[in-house]
Curated annotation (Swiss-Prot):
Residues 1-16 have a biased composition (Basic and acidic residues). This is Acid-sensing ion channel 2. It comes from Danio rerio (Zebrafish). Keywords: Cell membrane, Disulfide bond, Glycoprotein, Ion channel, Ion transport, Membrane, Sodium, Sodium channel, Sodium transport, Transmembrane, Transmembrane helix, Transport. It catalyses: Na(+)(in) = Na(+)(out). PROSITE patterns: ASC. GO terms for molecular function: ligand-gated sodium channel activity; pH-gated sodium channel activity. The gene is asic2. It is found in: Cell membrane. GO terms for cellular component: plasma membrane. The lineage of its organism: Eukaryota, Metazoa, Chordata, Craniata, Vertebrata. Residues 90-445 are extracellular. It is a multi-pass membrane protein.
Amino acid sequence: MDLKEACGSEASRETESGGMGSLGGHSSWQSFAHRSTLHGLRFIFPYSSSSSSSSSYRSTSRRLLWSAALLASLVLLVLESTERLAYFLSYPHVTSVDAVVSGSLVFPAVTVCNLNAYRFTRLTQNDLYHAGELLALLDVHLQIPEPHLAEPHVLAFLTEKSNFTNYRPKPFSMREFTERVGHDLKEMMLYCRFQGQECSHQDFKTVFTRYGKCYMFNAAEEGKTLRTTMKGGTGNGLEIMLDIQQDEYLPVWGETEETAFEAGVRVQIHSQAEPPFVHELGFGVAPGFQTFVATQEQRLTYLPPPWGECVSRALDSGLFQVYSVSACRIECETRYIVENCNCRMVYMPGDSPYCTPEQYKDCAEPALAALSAVEGTNCICRSPCNMTRYNKELSMVKIPSKTSARYLEKKFNRSEKYITDNILVLDVFFEALNYETIEQKKAYEVAGLLGDIGGQMGLFIGASILTLLELFDYAYEVVKERLLDLLNREEEEESHGEDVSTCDPVVNHSESISHTVSVPLQTTLGTLEEIAC
């Protein structure tokens, strides 16, 4: 056997045995397993300080049992941790409901719309010329379409106003027409009280909706404070008596968007921060009845994605300062009509020109109907993250009673039949002086996830975060030791090559002596350099 190879293999064995960092003949992994806080690891890789340890400590069957137990615990830990992580990534939420007693509450905005948008007797000849076909009062030839269905006084009025011989039409605006011909609250309102104090039509703000000209009580206006209420129950809210003026309703000879088959008013109770959306969110109040509306304020808080689907930012169009579902719907309708018809309807915000009656009939109303059919895809309006809603409970009684009919006839100079057909009373009040909070909360957060996984680690393998740090620290030390060992080997190989080259003549001399028989075969070995040389 060549002396160089023997010396090289011996040196490598010495390096390997020293590189493991063993103590007392044990591997570094056994030492780590003995010191580790990971339960069961020291029984799988036993470590004993003396060679006379009991055989049961190193029993193969015992090690296999501990290995199976640790493996099963690791599998259960992975399964449970995966389930907890999947639950966390589903972003669950819970909803909490609470009732809060308050000393006072801001009274909601109350929007009232007559179901008839335009007063018949306020129509002018110019109105009929431009909007007669839109209102279904005249046909495309500006003629009365169904004269046999009209009452005598209605037919006489239309016959007079629809004579357009030598008529020169004047400019026409749908906004001005709606403002002028819509029902006037000053004429409709017979009395008004808020918390027992008298109020008037001046306490209402004019707004425009799909029903035309409407009126909002307790609107948010600059320079005015919102009304509050200190008590709940009837008499501590808004009470108004209205005359719906059925004599002014447009005659119905066909189905159009501008004519109504019902009689009464449409009412919406809403927050001052959101615009009225009466045609969808309002409720009807019929004449001949006093309607009591007991309401309760609800303050809702929703979570943003990924836990929920609420929206907190304002609309990009800038038409409304505060985001709400109603504002989003109106903004969507406005954008759709402007894009398709190059105009906007009277109730729509913005600076685009108002649609003409022809654009209303030929474009805006059909486009709005088409949008409503596919609104789920074109108008996606999510709930705001914070909103105020009002629950309502309605009840009603008939008016007038037989005993009060004479008095009301005398007071309002109207017959009992007129009162039954036209007069209504609306009473809006808080059911109690408290509000309800409905709040979405995160059901599972990072702290809960870490707590669950930490609990599973402690239960199954008796580990903690520090145990994981132990594993990482051991892996770091092993990698570092291997790298240092590799570098030392390279340096030794380089230095070994240099030493061999310096003793080449001696090698030749030894080779010449090796042929001498008198050289003993068993020579005492010297240092590594002597052997190599």
